[in-house]
Amino acid sequence: MAELRAHRIAEQMKKELGEILSRKIKDPRVGFVTVTDVEVTGDLQQAKVYISVLGDEKKKQDTLLGLSKAKGFIRSEIGNRIRLRKTPEITFEFDEALEQGNRIETILRDLNK
């Protein structure tokens, strides 16, 4: 039962984070960010947000720095939008799955040539 609730909250957070990052964050370091997944622990105390960023490695690091500086604001916005007793602590991580998928697709395409 707790896993179902955690999954529902993760999906709601993913939706709200997408809107917050696109409309509310004014930091120039935060460029085009896509929230690919959110994992919330069963006790709803921590949330791991997976993001994808367009750009080179420097742009990715700048975006992560900007998001870490805005973490308090983002958490308060989530708290205002989703009614929870305690808003989960947010950590941002890069989603490497997209890059790995592209790399595998390139390898498979080269094999077929």
Swiss-Prot record:
Name the UniProt key words of this record, in alphabetical order: Cytoplasm, Ribosome biogenesis
Q: Where in the cell is it found?
A: Cytoplasm
Task: State the superkingdom.
Answer: Bacteria
Output the InterPro entries linked to this UniProt entry. KH_dom-like_a/b (IPR015946), RbfA (IPR000238), RbfA_dom_sf (IPR023799), Ribosome-bd_factorA_CS (IPR020053)
| Family the entry assigns | Belongs to the RbfA family.
Question: Per its database record, what is this protein's job?
Answer: One of several proteins that assist in the late maturation steps of the functional core of the 30S ribosomal subunit. Associates with free 30S ribosomal subunits (but not with 30S subunits that are part of 70S ribosomes or polysomes). Required for efficient processing of 16S rRNA. May interact with the 5'-terminal helix region of 16S rRNA.
What is the official name of this protein in its record? Answer: Ribosome-binding factor A
**Organism whose genome encodes this protein:** Oceanobacillus iheyensis (strain DSM 14371 / CIP 107618 / JCM 11309 / KCTC 3954 / HTE831)
